[in-house]
Structures are given as structure tokens and as C-alpha cells.
From Swiss-Prot:
One of its GO terms (biological process) is bioluminescence. It comes from Kryptophanaron alfredi symbiont. Its EC number is 1.14.14.3. Belongs to the bacterial luciferase oxidoreductase family. Light-emitting reaction in luminous bacteria. The specific role of the beta subunit is unknown, but it is absolutely required for bioluminescence activity. Transmembrane segments: none annotated. It is an enzyme of class 1 (oxidoreductase). One of its GO terms (molecular function) is alkanal monooxygenase (FMN-linked) activity. Keywords: Flavoprotein, FMN, Luminescence, Monooxygenase, Oxidoreductase, Photoprotein. This is Alkanal monooxygenase beta chain.
């Protein structure tokens, strides 16, 4: 599912922000 990929990307970005 594309949604899963988008969600993972969002999480990855969130971690990068920290």
C-alpha cells in the first residue's frame, strides 16, 4: 500500500527532525 510508504516516510522525517 502506498499509504504505508507515506507513513514510514513521515516517521523517518519526524525522527530526522529530532
Amino acid at each position: 500500500m502506498k499509504f504505508g510508504l507515506f507513513f514510514q516516510n513521515f516517521l523517518s522525517e519526524n525522527q530526522s527532525s529530532e
